[in-house]
């Protein structure tokens, strides 16, 4: 409720450096792998210099010194300490599911997910993947494992239990993440 639809219209990750967000943003520490992958994505799309400037703007807009995990960022927004949290949707869904207790579920119900950069390259996503090592001694079994991970049964397990997005057609994401 503290962030308007007009503020989110056309919102991008790059926009998080805008001074209008001063004191309104929470995010994990820069050493976290999620932030490193987001920064790598921004470097790929915008270059090193622009991304360095972006990072300075984000730091200037932080509501507090980065602390805690993604759920801590969501809790901070729910508590009114900030207006925007950079967090993975599966943590929000985990909280909404009640698996982390009633306090976190209640907090999660106070926030909404938003997917930036929808007018251009799309939202940055962290990827979970499987790969085969050339010369692996059990290649046939490794292929079977990857094939199993790509079955509807496995993908539904991921979407319903870890709230990840599915990788195959015919399996829908959990309603808690969309």
Tell what function each PLM region has.
Residues 1-81, 92-98, 121:
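Extracytoplasmic ligand-binding site segments that recognize negatively charged/polar headgroups
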Residues 21-24, 80-83, 108-111, 140-142:
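Loop/turn elements at helix/coil->beta-strand transitions in domains of secreted/extracellular proteins
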Residues 28, 87, 114-116:
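Conserved beta-strand termini and adjacent loop/short-helix elements that scaffold enzyme active sites
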Residues 29, 89-90, 161-162:
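Short secondary-structure boundary segments
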Residues 54-60, 64-67, 105-134:
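Periplasmic-binding protein-like
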Residues 84-108:
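A ligand-binding cleft/hinge motif common to bilobed small-molecule-binding domains
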Residues 128-178:
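Mature extracytoplasmic/periplasmic domains
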């Amino acid at each position: 409720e503290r962030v308007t639809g007009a503020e989110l219209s056309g919102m991008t990750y790059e926009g998080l450096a805008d001074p209008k967000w001063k004191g309104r943003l929470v995010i994990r520490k820069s050493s976290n792998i999620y932030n490193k992958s987001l920064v790598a994505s921004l470097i790929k799309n915008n270059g090193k210099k622009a991304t360095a400037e972006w990072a300075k703007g984000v730091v200037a807009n932080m509501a507090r010194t980065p602390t805690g995990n993604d759920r801590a960022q969501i809790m901070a927004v729910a508590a009114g300490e900030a207006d925007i949290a950079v967090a993975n949707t599966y943590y929000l869904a985990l909280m909404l599911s009640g698996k982390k207790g009633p306090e976190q579920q209640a907090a999660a119900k106070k926030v909404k997910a938003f997917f930036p950069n929808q007018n251009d390259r799309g939202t940055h996503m962290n990827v979970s993947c499987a790969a085969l090592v050339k010369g692996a001694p059990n290649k046939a079994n490794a292929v079977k494992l990857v094939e199993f991970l790509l079955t509807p049964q496995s993908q539904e397990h991921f979407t319903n239990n870890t709230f990840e997005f599915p990788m195959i057609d015919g399996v829908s994401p959990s309603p808690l993440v969309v």
